[in-house]
């Protein structure tokens, strides 16, 4: 087996650059989480900062507890969208693009 440390370092550097770019893109993105069929929506950045909460006027006459549940569900929906944007499948794709062959079934510990 021919082991080329220089090539491996180049591949690792390329993957690191791709990961940094993906992280910057994630930080700049915004997602919208919804609940109650869109009656409550939350706009969140890739850094998990909530930028906006929108509540349909029809909910203003509803009970407080239901409204709180809908807001929590919308926030959770937005969080899931941010987390899904940086899946281990994306990292595996970056590794492949950098020329790094990962074994089948290899999973990254962060997700």
UniProtKB/Swiss-Prot annotation:
It is found in: Cytoplasm, Nucleoid. GO terms for cellular component: bacterial nucleoid; cytosol. Residues 1-27 are annotated as: Disordered. Keywords: Cytoplasm, DNA-binding. Residues 17-27 have a biased composition (Basic and acidic residues). Its main location: cytoplasm. InterPro entries: YbaB-like_sf, YbaB/EbfC. Gene3D superfamilies: Nucleoid-associated protein YbaB-like domain (3.30.1310.10). SUPFAM superfamilies: YbaB-like (SSF82607). One of its GO terms (molecular function) is DNA binding. Binds to DNA and alters its conformation. May be involved in regulation of gene expression, nucleoid organization and DNA protection. NCBIfam families: DNA_YbaB_EbfC. Homodimer. Belongs to the YbaB/EbfC family. This is Nucleoid-associated protein Fphi_0115.
């Amino acid at each position: 087996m021919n082991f080329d440390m220089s090539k491996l370092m180049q591949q690792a550097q390329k993957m690191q650059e791709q990961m940094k770019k993906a992280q910057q893109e994630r930080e700049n993105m915004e997602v919208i989480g919804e609940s109650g069929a869109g009656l409550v929506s939350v706009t969140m950045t890739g850094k998990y900062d909530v930028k906006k909460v929108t509540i349909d006027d029809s909910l203003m006459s509803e009970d407080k507890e239901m409204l709180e549940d809908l807001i929590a569900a919308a926030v959770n929906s937005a969080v899931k969208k941010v987390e899904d944007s940086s899946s281990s499948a994306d990292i595996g794709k970056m590794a492949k693009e950098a020329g790094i062959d990962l074994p089948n079934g290899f999973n990254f510990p962060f997700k």
